[in-house]
C-alpha cells in the first residue's frame, strides 16, 4: 500500500515538473535581457535616490551596491527563478522610486558590508562588546 502511494506521488511530481511553464521568459536569453533592463533601470535611478533621500553615500557607492546585489544572483540559470528575482527587483525599484521606502530602508542595504559582530566570549571581550 505504501509503495503504491509513493509511486503515485512520484508520478504526480514528474507530471508537475514537466508541465511547469515559465513566468515571463521563454528561455534563458530572454530572462537575461530582462535582468539587463532591470539593472539599467536601477543604475539610472541611483542618482535620483541619493539626492532625493539625502543618503550619506556617493552615487558611485550606490551603483557599486546595485552591482553587488545583482552579482549575488549571477549563478542562477533557471529562467523561472530569474523571472521571479526580476519581479522582486522591479517591486523594490518601484517602492524606491515612489518613496514608499524611507531612508533607513535604503540604507539597510549598506549594512551588509560591515564586519559581523563576534560570537564567542573572547572575541567580544577583545572588541569591547558586552557578552
Curated annotation (Swiss-Prot):
InterPro entries named in the record: Complex1_LYR_NDUFA6_LYRM6, NADH_Ub_cplx-1_asu_su-6
Membrane topology type: Peripheral membrane protein
Natural source organism: Mus musculus
Subunit annotation: Mammalian complex I is composed of 45 different subunits.
Reported function: Accessory subunit of the mitochondrial membrane respiratory chain NADH dehydrogenase (Complex I), that is believed to be not involved in catalysis. Required for proper complex I assembly. Complex I functions in the transfer of electrons from NADH to the respiratory chain. The immediate electron acceptor for the enzyme is believed to be ubiquinone.
Major subcellular site: mitochondrion
Keyword Electron transport: yes
Localisation: Mitochondrion inner membrane
Keywords for this protein: Electron transport, Membrane, Mitochondrion, Mitochondrion inner membrane, Respiratory chain, Transport
Cystine pairs: none
PANTHER family per record: NADH DEHYDROGENASE [UBIQUINONE] 1 ALPHA SUBCOMPLEX SUBUNIT 6 (PTHR12964:SF0), NADH-UBIQUINONE OXIDOREDUCTASE B14 SUBUNIT (PTHR12964)
Gene label: Ndufa6
One biological process term in Gene Ontology: mitochondrial respiratory chain complex I assembly
GO CC field: mitochondrial inner membrane; mitochondrion; respiratory chain complex I
Pfam families assigned: Complex1_LYR_2 (PF13233)
Family (UniProt): Belongs to the complex I LYR family.
Protein name: NADH dehydrogenase [ubiquinone] 1 alpha subcomplex subunit 6
Amino acid at each position: 500500500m505504501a509503495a503504491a502511494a509513493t509511486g503515485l506521488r512520484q508520478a504526480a511530481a514528474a507530471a508537475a515538473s514537466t508541465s511547469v511553464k515559465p513566468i515571463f521568459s521563454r528561455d534563458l536569453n530572454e530572462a537575461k535581457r530582462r535582468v539587463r533592463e532591470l539593472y539599467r533601470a536601477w543604475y539610472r535611478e541611483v542618482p535620483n535616490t541619493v539626492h532625493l533621500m539625502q543618503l550619506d553615500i556617493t552615487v558611485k557607492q550606490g551603483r557599486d551596491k546595485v552591482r553587488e546585489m545583482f552579482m549575488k544572483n549571477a549563478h542562477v540559470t533557471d529562467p523561472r527563478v530569474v523571472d521571479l528575482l526580476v519581479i522582486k527587483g522591479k517591486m523594490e525599484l518601484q517602492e524606491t522610486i515612489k518613496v514608499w521606502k524611507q531612508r533607513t530602508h535604503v540604507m539597510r542595504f549598506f549594512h551588509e558590508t560591515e564586519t559581523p559582530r563576534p560570537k564567542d566570549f573572547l572575541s567580544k571581550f577583545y572588541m569591547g562588546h558586552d557578552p
